[in-house]
């Protein structure tokens, strides 16, 4: 980074530019240069451990920063004609006034609107309530903190997007190594290989693919029961985990969705409101290569799950103690797909549905020593050609020449030879 600096600050000391003072042509490689209200700094070059701080009412013009140099612009301060190069960091809120350019293009913040910033190396932007930011790039250790609204944010490796309650984000892209923490609202998020945690917020039309991980209802320390995701798409290589909250409508194509068992006393988590319900509602489609694993006790009553050929739905009751286990669900459509029922040592298994129909297979995995004719039964409307296979815990087939035979009253089915 070139400079015609006349003043050199490299001793780690602090210099203050006071009201009415102007400092020009400064090379700042270590230490702090603070521009107070009414002060002015021009043609400052900030690198290394240098830090230019523009306080409220202060002005900086033609600042260059990079190579670990930092520019901080306080609320009500002004920094114009900035040049940001590789390794530079800028820290500010939407109450500052700045403009300049970086390797990716031009950027500005003015009157509560921010556009085009590149935030990296610890740089951050705070989007205040009622303000807006768009086309922000977050890279290594760059952060965007949103209490207002934001759109078209790209989060790359090491970057972090945080949307607080009351904040909103739209059309954001989270790439490999990027993180999105949501407590407000978000729509049309693309998780292209990053991580998103919904911490009691609401998101819709989120796409998860290519190694990305989406988590609803947890940050790894606490469960948040108030979270909700709608119209979730999980494509090849994507993974979604519902620890708490509600999943409404989903299409899974080649990806994996896991609904964990709800808990009120998990020693690994602090539980919001002493409860952590997990709820699945609306329409869920499991397409070729897709899998959905649902822990025991999740509320599935308002769901309709369609399992296409090559798709797998797993209801996991392996944690249930005792001789019987009951799986309750809304509607299941088997269009060539498989439904696995996982049990422990239970000797009686019941599947309660509003409606089970189509053509496909139910696979029952059990550790039970004996299998009786009434080992499994279904309560609810049953239609179609549904085969049944029973396996041991290692999924070695015990019996596969079985089918579900609807009862005469039409409100259930029992196990019969095929």
UniProtKB/Swiss-Prot annotation:
Q: Which Pfam families match?
A: AIDA, Pertactin
Entries under InterPro entries matching the protein: AIDA, Autotransporter_pectin_lyase_C, Pectin_lyase_fold/virulence, Pertactin_central
Q: What is the protein name given in its UniProt record?
A: Uncharacterized protein YdhQ
Q: What gene is behind this protein?
A: ydhQ
């Amino acid at each position: 980074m070139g400079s015609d600096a006349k003043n050199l600050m490299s001793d780690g000391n602090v210099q203050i530019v006071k009201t009415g003072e102007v400092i020009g042509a400064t090379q700042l490689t270590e230490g702090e240069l603070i521009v107070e209200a009414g002060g002015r700094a021009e043609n400052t070059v900030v690198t290394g451990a240098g830090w230019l701080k523009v306080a409220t009412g202060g002005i900086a013009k033609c600042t260059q920063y990079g190579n670990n140099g930092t520019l901080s612009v306080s609320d009500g301060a002004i920094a114009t004609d900035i040049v940001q190069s590789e390794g530079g960091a800028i820290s500010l809120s939407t109450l500052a006034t700045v403009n300049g350019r970086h390797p990716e293009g031009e950027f500005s913040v003015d009157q509560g609107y921010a556009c085009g910033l590149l935030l990296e190396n610890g740089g951050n932007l705070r989007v205040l309530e009622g303000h807006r930011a768009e086309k922000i790039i977050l890279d290594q250790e760059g952060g965007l903190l949103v209490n207002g609204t934001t759109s078209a944010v790209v989060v790359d490796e090491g970057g972090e997007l945080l949307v607080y309650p009351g904040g909103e984000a739209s059309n954001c892209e989270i790439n490999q190594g990027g993180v999105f923490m949501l407590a407000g609202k978000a729509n049309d998020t693309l998780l292209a290989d990053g991580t998103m945690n919904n911490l009691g917020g609401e998101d819709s039309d989120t796409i998860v693919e290519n190694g990305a991980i989406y988590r609803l209802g947890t940050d790894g320390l606490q469960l948040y029961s108030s979270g909700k995701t709608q119209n979730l798409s999980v494509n090849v290589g994507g993974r979604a985990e519902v620890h708490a909250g509600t999943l409404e409508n989903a299409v899974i194509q080649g990806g994996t969705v896991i609904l964990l068992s709800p808990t009120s006393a998990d020693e690994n988590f602090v539980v919001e409101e002493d409860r952590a319900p997990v709820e699945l509602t609306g329409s869920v489609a499991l397409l070729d290569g897709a899998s959905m694993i649902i822990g025991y006790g999740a509320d599935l009553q308002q769901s309709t799950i369609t399992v296409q050929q090559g798709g797998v739905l797993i209801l996991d009751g392996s944690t249930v103690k005792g001789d019987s286990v009951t799986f309750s669900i809304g509607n299941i459509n088997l269009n060539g797909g498989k439904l696995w029922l996982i049990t422990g040592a239970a000797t009686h298994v019941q599947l309660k549905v509003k409606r089970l129909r189509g053509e496909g297979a139910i696979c029952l995995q059990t550790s039970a020593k004996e299998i009786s004719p009434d080992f499994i039964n279904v309560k609810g409307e049953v239609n179609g050609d549904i085969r049944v296979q029973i396996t041991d815990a290692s999924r070695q087939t015990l019996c596969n020449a079985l089918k579900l035979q609807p009862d005469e009253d039409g409100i259930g089915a029992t196990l019969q030879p095929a």
